[in-house]
Amino acid sequence: MGNTKSGALSKEILEELQLNTKFTQEELCTWYQSFLKECPSGRISKKQFESIYSKFFPDADPKAYAQHVFRSFDANNDGTLDFKEYMIALMMTSSGKANQKLEWAFCLYDVDGNGTINKKEVLEIITAIFKMINAEDQKHLPEDENTPEKRTNKIWVYFGKKDDDKLTEGEFIQGIVKNKEILRLIQYEPQKVKDKLKEKKH
């Protein structure tokens, strides 16, 4: 947890964020000043996070997905994120090291936090992702994955699971490493998130 209540970012947090987000020091300081304007306390609530996330997707409904992203990064369940957690949350959805990203993806899909993923949880996240895909883009999705239910079924088949089976973190990560098609199916198009972040920054 970083202390982000002061007017300037600490050297340690800056270095860590430069490493994890690939933003320059100048860019991070700009993000931080913007963050403090919206969240003077140095912490962001779930509602504020949803509001900021919504600005990236004016032609879609990212609220449900934003709630799940927030949950997955609110490690101590206090209902807030500090600046470091906030930036990593935004960037982990669009970039990040492979292992970190897969570990985060498991947390995202483990909706109830019990250490395993079931098919219902996959459907919940996929449904949230579909709300972020505009109607025109949905028309161009392959026939066997153009609804949340179809995409969830396809993912579950790729993992070799029956409807009532559960996935452990090891199975989840191993399955994706072996079959990159699963990674494509479980995530919102990362390039679109990256583009939205760059638009917001300028």
UniProtKB/Swiss-Prot annotation:
Keywords: Calcium, Lipoprotein, Metal-binding, Myristate, Repeat, Sensory transduction, Vision
Any GO MF annotation of the entry: calcium ion binding
InterPro entries given in the database record: EF-hand-dom_pair, EF_Hand_1_Ca_BS, EF_hand_dom, Recoverin
Signal sequence residues: none
Pfam families in the record: EF-hand_5 (PF13202), EF-hand_7 (PF13499)
Keyword presence, Nucleus: no
The protein, known as: S-modulin
Residues binding Ca(2+) 1: D74, N76, D78, T80, E85
Native species: Aquarana catesbeiana
Lineage: Eukaryota, Metazoa, Chordata, Craniata, Vertebrata
Binding site for Ca(2+) 2: D110, D112, N114, T116, E121
PROSITE patterns, alphabetized: EF_HAND_1, EF_HAND_2
